[in-house]
C-alpha cells in the first residue's frame, strides 16, 4: 500500500504523459495538456510520483541526502527533469544546494529547442519569474548538432561543422 493515496499520480486507466514539457513555460498552455505532461506516467512500469504531496517531497529530499552522504556524491543526474512538477523540483534543488553548496545537479531536459532548454537552467531570467535552481542541464542541442555535423561531409552554410558553431554561438541564452 502507498503511504498516501496521492503518492503517485493515478488515473482510472493507464495514462501516459503527453511529453509536452513546453507546457511548463507556455503562459497559454491548456491546463489539460499541462496536467497530462506533469501527471501522466512515462511508461507502464514507471509511475509518476506526485511531488505536490509535501510528505513525498520531504522524503525525496531526505532520500537524496542519504545517497549523497552514503556514496559521497559530488553530483546528481535527474532523469526526465521537466516531467516533474516544476515548483517542488525547484524547492528540492534549492534545499539540496543549501545543504551542499558545491553539489552539482544536472537535469536531463531532452529538447533540441535552445530557449526551452535554457528555461530549466537555474538563474535564467525566465519571463514568468520562475527559477528552477537547477545548476546544470544536458546540452542536447549541441549533441544533436555534433551528430549531424559528424555524419556529413557537406560544407554548405547550414550543414556540417557550422551546425556545431551555430549551436555554441547560441550559448548567450543560457544563464551561465
PLM region spans:
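Sequence-level motif detector for i,i+2 pairs with an aromatic at +2
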Residues: 44, 175-176
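Active-site-proximal helices and loops of the catalytic beta/alpha 8
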Residues: 63-75, 80-175
Amino acid at each position: 500500500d502507498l503511504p498516501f493515496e496521492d503518492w503517485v499520480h493515478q488515473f482510472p486507466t493507464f495514462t501516459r504523459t503527453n511529453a509536452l514539457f513546453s507546457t511548463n513555460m507556455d503562459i497559454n498552455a491548456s491546463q489539460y495538456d499541462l496536467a497530462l505532461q506533469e501527471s501522466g506516467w512515462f511508461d507502464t512500469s514507471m509511475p509518476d510520483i506526485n511531488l505536490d504531496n509535501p510528505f513525498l517531497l520531504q522524503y525525496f529530499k531526505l532520500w537524496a541526502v542519504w545517497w549523497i552522504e552514503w556514496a559521497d556524491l559530488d553530483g546528481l543526474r535527474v532523469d526526465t527533469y521537466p516531467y516533474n512538477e516544476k515548483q517542488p523540483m525547484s524547492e528540492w534543488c534549492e534545499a539540496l544546494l543549501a545543504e551542499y553548496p558545491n553539489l552539482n545537479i544536472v537535469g536531463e531536459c531532452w529538447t533540441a529547442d535552445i530557449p526551452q532548454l535554457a528555461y530549466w537552467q537555474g538563474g535564467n531570467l525566465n519571463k514568468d519569474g520562475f527559477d528552477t535552481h537547477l545548476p546544470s542541464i544536458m546540452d542536447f542541442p549541441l549533441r544533436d548538432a555534433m551528430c549531424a555535423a559528424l555524419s556529413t561531409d557537406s560544407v554548405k552554410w547550414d550543414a556540417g561543422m557550422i551546425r556545431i558553431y551555430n549551436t555554441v554561438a547560441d550559448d548567450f541564452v543560457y544563464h551561465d
